[in-house]
Amino acid sequence: MLLEKIVEAISGRSEDNGKKVKGTIVLMKKNVLDFNDVNASLLDGVLEFLGKRVSLQLISVVHADPGNSLQGKRSNPAYLEKWLTTGTSLVAGESAFDVTFDWDEDIGVPGAFIINNFHFNEFYLKSLTLEDVPNHGNVHFVCNSWVYPAKKYKSERIFFANQAYLPGETPEPLRNYREKELVNLRGNGNGKLEEWDRVYDYALYNDLGDPEKGKQYARTILGGSAEYPYPRRGRTGRKPTKADPKSESRIPLLMSLDIYVPRDERFGHIKLSDFLTYALKSIVQFLIPEFQALFDSTPDEFDSFEDVLKLYEGGIKLPQGPFLKALTDSIPLEILKEIIRTDGEGKFKFPTPQVIQEDKSSWRTDEEFAREMLAGVNPVIISRLQEFPPKSQLDSEVYGNQNSTITKEHIENTLDGLTIDDAIKTNRLYILNHHDILMPYVRRINTTNTKLYASRTLLFLQDDGTMKPVAIELSLPHPDGDELGAVSKVYTPADQGVEGSIWQLAKAYVAVNDSGVHQLISHWLNTHAAIEPFVIATNRQLSVLHPIHKLLHPHFRDTMNINALARQILINAGGVLEMTVFPAKYAMEMSAVVYKSWVFPEQALPADLIKRGVAVEDSSSPHGVRLLIQDYPYAVDGLEIWSAIKSWVTEYCNFYYKSDELVLKDNELQAWWKELREEGHGDKKDEPWWPKMQTRQELKDSCTIIIWIASALHAAVNFGQYPYAGYLPNRPTLSRRFMPEPGTPEYEELKTNPDKAYLKTITPQLQTLLGISLIEILSRHASDEIYLGQRDSSEWTKDQEPIAAFERFGKKLSEIEDQIIQMNGDKKWKNRSGPVNVPYTLLFPTSEQGLTGKGIPNSVSI
């Protein structure tokens, strides 16, 4: 207290007896969040003592200053109090500080404030609450932003009160501030962006390769071409490489966590213990050379499924090498334990995945194989078979005849007495079709250590609602040229002898296909990559005052950061994904080819289900569609979640937009949608399917899709990764040899030791360790996760009707949770648990921290 008085005396600040308005600032000091910066607090204390403090000025929402371009009138500066005594301690490193403003009647009601940080270090500003503003009451400002020292900024830092305004309704004293803040966030498109920058801008995916390391590390630039279209990523402004001026230079691996994203998109708000788990993605990368060296010199194999189970039950000894020793010597033990699940004896050990918790072998059944297409980690691919045999959409002049060779004779005896025509007419035949996506790449992929087929799997919907596979077709390009078509072989179910072992291998080749398509398309492309342009455009074109910004902003949390980290250490040349998924160096290029068929309106769940033929439009059904597979857990729960999101968005948008005319006249909204089409998804700008954004319905539909992608769709394809793929034999990521042919040693091994033959075909031991390490982290919920129906502040808006609508949304989600629990307990719904007895909870809205196999975070945050 005495110290504060001395500071006031030195700096000439003292109390006067005029009218005051008190406020409370909530913030986190840098030293709480940055364990490497022990000097942060000391330096700021010195500056505080010298009078260089944190100042705030209120801005009037009702009275303009004629001498300042009619911008809102400003109050005299006020200063944060008791910085040296740290303020009142709150949760998770937060502190509350008092600030007292000299009240000027000319201010009227404050609608914004300017903050200047004259300290040496940045701090994380959570909120400001003004108490008892004369003739008004309390005013709340939600900030959630890093405030760097004022000298780092070219313009003032401004924060607005929690009252939403459409652009045309903005009070005149705030209008100029609103527009200038958007200009600041857009930047000027030039130069390298620094840590403290807040610039949102676009770039191509031209930073995945590292051509300066050699040709083998060069990668195709994604985006900006008809051949390889792609959504845009956030710009970093790093220099081009010397080897290829079109490619952006990369930062060193050790600096991965410092890759540029706008400062408020960083993981800085995550508590330190969780932050280390994100760092794992980077540190695991250092293990790769060691893994590779071991793999080259001692190609260790799992000899049996018992060997694989040791990963979870007893641990597996990690072979020692110089690189690993250097790593263990240089990393603190507690971090190393987190990274490699070591038990102190250098063993990898992992949590037991749900798929083998109840039964160690049920994953091998045909029923479970099929069920996971409806309730597993990739339930978004299966479609209804509408013509037989299945036909290819590939260009026959380039690829020859790629139509299926499955015949009636292959499957009619497994259709419960139905003919194929009857089965198709009664919606009983379905297909998991990876043929056309993969065939153009199979020849190139098979020049590597991977040996891959393009697959088609036919399934029959049985009377009890379960599916059974009835045929698997594995295809290779013709050895004499692509134009000669496919060389295919059809396999049918068997459970005894060598035929049974061959059938198990056929399912494994399908699982390999599905694993790669899941990771690259269903997961990365359709959620992570597709949503990033919406994050960028929203921050560039919609003011924080805009109601649609307030609606969408929670669904963008951490997305740019996790995507930037992915570019740095996961999807880059030689990264973890290339090492663990079969397309290897062709992985991202393949996803760009698939993006050609991406259609925004088809990302809506009902539209997707109809497109795949697993549902039909039906106005009498609760969600406007009728499922043709009644026991389809992803679709059943998904439609409930979709409907809840749609109702919430409808109520919210109807409150702010009373007519279509307001949508048309909203200049920020129109600029946002134009930029999304022409810049963010610029390679799709001329597509006729884009909503015109001329009506309230188009706005509501588009916002519902955006929220669905960021929340429920991502949850459905992400958080089941460890529960199902944490046991690699169930979802192998690689196949290393072709199907054994009679008369070969491999065929004899298949007869005498089928389990070993299976394990020698799929992902090898070291890639298994790496892959499991990765998906364990990707499947975890952070302790500060915010789930669908939740907000990080109860004061997110001043408008009471949207608050009430949001509460109804939360209540509806709670009812859906009860419904999921009830259905999972009803034995009638066989696909909800299956032979492995893993209840379907991937669309259960809430979750605890950790590896739970449930929970829908608001955003693509991991």
UniProtKB/Swiss-Prot annotation:
Known tissue expression: Not detected in leaves, stems, flowers, roots, tubers and stolons during normal growth and development.
A single cellular component GO annotation: cytoplasm
Residues that coordinate or bind Fe cation: 523, 528, 714, 718, 862
InterPro entries reported for this sequence: LipOase (IPR000907), LipOase_C (IPR013819), LipOase_C_sf (IPR036226), LipOase_CS (IPR020834), LipOase_Fe_BS (IPR020833), LipOase_plant (IPR001246), Lipoxy_PLAT/LH2 (IPR042057), Lipoxygenase_dom_3 (IPR027433)
Major localisation: cytoplasm
Molecular function GO terms recorded: linoleate 9S-lipoxygenase activity; metal ion binding; oxidoreductase activity, acting on single donors with incorporation of molecular oxygen, incorporation of two atoms of oxygen
UniProt entry tagged with the keyword Lipid biosynthesis: yes
Known pathway: Lipid metabolism; oxylipin biosynthesis
Top-level lineage group: Eukaryota
Boundaries of every Lipoxygenase domain copy: 164-862
Domain PLAT span(s) in chain numbering: 36-161
Co-factor binding comment: Binds 1 Fe cation per subunit. Iron is tightly bound.
Localization in the cell: Cytoplasm
Disulfide bonds: none
GO BP annotations listed: fatty acid biosynthetic process; lipid oxidation; oxylipin biosynthetic process
Catalytic activity: (9Z,12Z)-octadecadienoate + O2 = (9S)-hydroperoxy-(10E,12Z)-octadecadienoate
Cofactor: Fe cation
Induction: Up-regulated within 6 hours after pathogen infection, ethylene or jasmonate treatments. Not induced by wounding.
EC number per UniProt: 1.13.11.58
Keyword Lipid metabolism: yes
Enzyme class: oxidoreductase
PANTHER family: LIPOXYGENASE (PTHR11771)
Family: Belongs to the lipoxygenase family.
Assembly, per entry: Monomer.
Described function: Plant lipoxygenases may be involved in a number of diverse aspects of plant physiology including growth and development, pest resistance, and senescence or responses to wounding. May contribute to cell death during the hypersensitive response (HR) by the massive production of free fatty acid hydroperoxides. Catalyzes the hydroperoxidation of lipids containing a cis,cis-1,4-pentadiene structure.
Protein name as it appears in the record: Probable linoleate 9S-lipoxygenase 5
Organism: Solanum tuberosum
Lineage of the organism: Eukaryota, Viridiplantae, Streptophyta, Embryophyta, Tracheophyta
